[in-house]
Amino acid sequence: SLVGSEMCIRDRLKGITLTLATTALVACGPGQKQSNFSSSSMHTTETENLLANLKKVSSKGIMFGHHDDTNYGIGWDGEEGRSDVKSVCGDYPAVISFDLGHIELGDTVSLDNVPFSKIRQEILSQYKRGGMSSLSWHLRNPLTGGDSWDVSDTTVVKSVLPGGSNHEKFTGWVSKVSAFINSLQTEDGVKVPVLFRPWHEHTGSWFWWGEKLCTPEEYKALWQMTVDILREDGVNNALYAYSPGSEPQDTVQYLNRYPGDELVDVIGFDTYQFDRDSYIANLEKSLAIIDSIGKTHNKVIAITETGYEGISDSKWWTETLLPVIEKYPIVYVLVWRNARERVTHFYAPYPGQVSANDFVEFYKDPKTLFAADVNSLYK
């Protein structure tokens, strides 16, 4: 078929792009019987390999990501192997993100009504197909009992730090995240690496850990404490991502609440399109900032969340997003979820959506990487 021949051509193009990325990788990934440990770090070998390969991948192309991609989409929920992205272009995203909100409560389903058992299964599936999984955490407010967006009290972060009234409760909450990440194991006992992205968009003030709700020192202490608890709980299969919004205007502002190089592997930012011109300006500004910091701090850089709700622009992928991002060595760009319960709340196309054909062109571009393009991340 024409589609098949187009895909063959596209695969050959991408194969050329990726040859260098895949030939030099040492095999010690999903096929082995158990995780090895790198003597120089607190990471499993697979996790060390992931970090090393992320640094290589960014010189070959940009991985495409989508939140909750295989959990649900427009007009479907929980169907095995289904993906709106795959339905449009024939491949899964190279990166899929998931959210752990409500795991702290001991619930069996997330704040978006996805069973944590399903999230675990999808992370394992993404690992087996060679892609990467990222985790965010829209947790409840430990002081008020409200959600992440409850900013009615400005002392929440202070209350969870050592000596605070909610410190013990919070420590237990983080340990539930530890237990989940530690449970991500293949049948052969290999711990699956994930990118954990806590305390995101903190340069705004819409979450209880936001800029106006804690001091820079309190925010950094929150980060340090979170990573310390995870490490003490034996989590050795996590990399960490720091992702403010697009509010920082320069590197100094970006680093104002940066918790430190020893706690962060990936730096990025979240920004969404409302007005096209200001979106492009925000992208350019924020990409220049993380590109500069990434080089000086030796960090992987990414667009950790972005998108255009409803994608009403039929050429958005190739005429707005791609021309800006292809100029920078970012490792991935991730768009938000296709909500099955809010039919206008979607950020990736589905079959018949107005930008679907353009997304196929975006997919065929040698600079964009999908799951089949990055199957050696852990080797």
Where are these regions (language model features)?
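Aromatic-lined carbohydrate-recognition surfaces of secreted/lumenal glycan-active proteins
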Residues: 65-67, 197-199, 223-252, 299-311, ...
